Amino acid sequence: MTNLRKTHPLMKIISQSFIDLPAPSNISAWWNFGSLLGICLIIQIVTGLFLAMHYTSDTSTAFSSVAHICRDVNHGWLIRNIHANGASMFFMCLFLHVGRGVYYGSYLFKETWNIGVILLLTVMATAFVGYVLPWGQMSFWGATVITNLLSAIPYIGTTLVEWIWGGFSVDKATLTRFFAFHFILPFIIMALVMVHLLFLHETGSNNPSGINSNADKIPFHPYYTIKDILGLILMTTVLLTLAMFSPDLLGDPDNFTPANPLNTPPHIKPEWYFLFAYAILRSIPNKLGGVLALLTSILVLLIIPLLHTSTQRGLMFRPISQTLFWILTANLLTLTWIGGQPVEEPFIIIGQLASILYFTLIIILLPLAGVFENRMLEPKFP
């Protein structure tokens, strides 16, 4: 009798992707984040679905419907806290996943990398529209400030903003359409994830050494299924600890106040995972320039494969590039800190210097380091 797992049209696809998939024998814990992101996505879709059953996307009832979920719905407080903090875990895993890709040269799988960047942008869009839904002060003003940035586009800007708003300000129409976007985007993300995996399985996984591992492959199950389960346990422990003990740790206190168009909060700032981009946006005094810098800060990831100058794939054996990579990491943490600070000295100048350093490291210094390291490795005969 033939094995159903290997012959059934649907089960065969699952088997080839998660059971019999040949994987490098030496991939480290940095390769766990892909599966963790998949789990995060499932958690967010499931909790989001239950929240959508009780939420109302109308300006007069949105805030109180969220309060109703937390007070009156069975375990509603838990579902909401898991969903809100699940977004933070999602971005934490995303940043580590992208960082791994940059460090180990995984971006040389160009199709997988480009789909990944599109996924990052889509997840950011989903998180942004989702943050507007509770209709608190920071939800309302965050939506107003960020959508207003589109007015910097020459000629069509103002029309575009009013078209997105569905009126002359952020109001009922905006909230309703943002709820629709927030509902549909995770399913688009799911489809993109499948394409991401499709391209990855065309080439097979990269590994820490950066060299071809075809000669030494092991089956995904049981080796990496067990390893992924360990990652899952650790992540869910952190998530549940956060959701149960300090669910509001990463949120903004202003969002406990219902949206009021007549009262501006003292400091308008997004959630922690957008602060680095927000700092880059604010570091340029010109509106259009800031918007372009904001976009470029993410889209620069698309040109990283073109900036690869080294003869080696990853940074495993390249100490100069490694140093620059960790400076870039520290720089991103600095930008995250600056994004949460008020617009005053010395934060303005620190933000501007960190923004310049961010682009300089990626576009100039890392490619130059690659060339320099190549020269150092050239054999020198007497």
Swiss-Prot record:
Binding site for heme b b566: 97, 196
Identification of the protein by name: Cytochrome b
Note: Heme 1 (or BL or b562) is low-potential and absorbs at about 562 nm, and heme 2 (or BH or b566) is high-potential and absorbs at about 566 nm.
Keywords, alphabetical: Electron transport, Heme, Iron, Membrane, Metal-binding, Mitochondrion, Mitochondrion inner membrane, Respiratory chain, Transmembrane, Transmembrane helix, Transport, Ubiquinone
Transmembrane segments: 33-53, 77-98, 113-133, 178-198, 226-246, 288-308, 320-340, 347-367
Name of the gene this protein is made from: MT-CYB
Family: Belongs to the cytochrome b family.
Major site of localization recorded for this protein: mitochondrion
Topological relation to the membrane, as annotated: Multi-pass membrane protein
Cofactors, names only: heme b
Keyword Ion transport applies: no
Pfam family, one: Cytochrom_B_C
Binding partners and assembly: The cytochrome bc1 complex contains 11 subunits: 3 respiratory subunits (MT-CYB, CYC1 and UQCRFS1), 2 core proteins (UQCRC1 and UQCRC2) and 6 low-molecular weight proteins (UQCRH/QCR6, UQCRB/QCR7, UQCRQ/QCR8, UQCR10/QCR9, UQCR11/QCR10 and a cleavage product of UQCRFS1). This cytochrome bc1 complex then forms a dimer.
CDD domains: cytochrome_b_C, Cytochrome_b_N
Function, in words: Component of the ubiquinol-cytochrome c reductase complex (complex III or cytochrome b-c1 complex) that is part of the mitochondrial respiratory chain. The b-c1 complex mediates electron transfer from ubiquinol to cytochrome c. Contributes to the generation of a proton gradient across the mitochondrial membrane that is then used for ATP synthesis.
Residues at which heme b b562 binds: 83, 182
UniProt GO molecular function: metal ion binding; ubiquinol-cytochrome-c reductase activity
Entry keyword Isomerase: no
Highest taxon above the source species: Eukaryota
Highest classification ranks of the organism: Eukaryota, Metazoa, Chordata, Craniata, Vertebrata
Note on cofactor: Binds 2 heme b groups non-covalently.
Cell compartments where the protein resides: Mitochondrion inner membrane
Source organism of this protein record: Glironia venusta (Bushy-tailed opossum)
